[in-house]
From Swiss-Prot:
Protein name: NEDD8-conjugating enzyme Ubc12
Known outcome of mutating residue 12 to A: Impairs thioester intermediate formation
Protein function: Accepts the ubiquitin-like protein NEDD8 from the UBA3-NAE1 E1 complex and catalyzes its covalent attachment to other proteins. The specific interaction with the E3 ubiquitin ligase RBX1, but not RBX2, suggests that the RBX1-UBE2M complex neddylates specific target proteins, such as CUL1, CUL2, CUL3 and CUL4. Involved in cell proliferation.
Family per record: Belongs to the ubiquitin-conjugating enzyme family. UBC12 subfamily.
Biological classification of the source: Eukaryota, Metazoa, Chordata, Craniata, Vertebrata
Species this protein is from: Homo sapiens (Human)
UniProt entry tagged with the keyword Acetylation: yes
């Protein structure tokens, strides 16, 4: 009993001195779940994930380089911010690459049902990555954030394809300039 008391006392002294022998901070439910999600990732060959701080799994980047469809040969970067409410709340996902896409607006907001009303705690980071990849293979003009791009896709697929190619090469679509995003 005395040994246990002295260990507790020693730990208190170390913490008050600012030195801890290992992390005394407990991992949150969000951190534990994101660790599990990351460990179980099964990334498609068109995707890559990176962490600017390897100790911070709650903030990371995803790069998608589609190998087919309208966006073939493009390189699109997404930021993920996982809140403490995860997995009960979806992560915040933003597209950092300005893209001409019906489901991604010019500010980078993403219209993906599993990031909004269809989110369920059983969904994982892998589910979101596959959902984002699918948006590049099959843009959905029925649920748009960029209404202009959605209209063009519905009414003139050839013009939509030309606009996507022009935007990925770097150029103007109307009065909006798009940076080059070809890999």
């Amino acid at each position: 009993m005395i040994k246990l008391f002295s260990l507790k006392q020693q730990k208190k002294e170390e913490e008050s001195a600012g030195g801890t022998k290992g992390s005394s901070k407990k991992a949150s439910a969000a951190q534990l779940r994101i660790q599990k999600d990351i460990n179980e990732l099964n990334l498609p060959k068109t995707c890559d994930i990176s962490f600017s701080d390897p100790d911070d799994l709650l903030n990371f980047k995803l790069v998608i380089c589609p190998d087919e469809g309208f966006y073939k040969s493009g390189k699109f970067v997404f930021s993920f911010k996982v809140g403490q409410g995860y997995p009960h709340d979806p992560p915040k996902v933003k597209c950092e690459t300005m893209v001409y896409h019906p489901n991604i607006d010019l500010e980078g907001n993403v219209c993906l049902n599993i990031l909004r009303e269809d989110w369920k705690p059983v969904l994982t980071i892998n589910s979101i990555i596959y959902g984002l990849q699918y948006l590049f293979l099959e843009p959905n003009p029925e649920d748009p954030l960029n209404k202009e791009a959605a209209e063009v896709l519905q009414n003139n697929r050839r013009l939509f394809e030309q606009n996507v190619q022009r935007s990925m090469r770097g150029g103007y679509i109307g009065s909006t300039y798009f940076e080059r995003c070809l890999k």
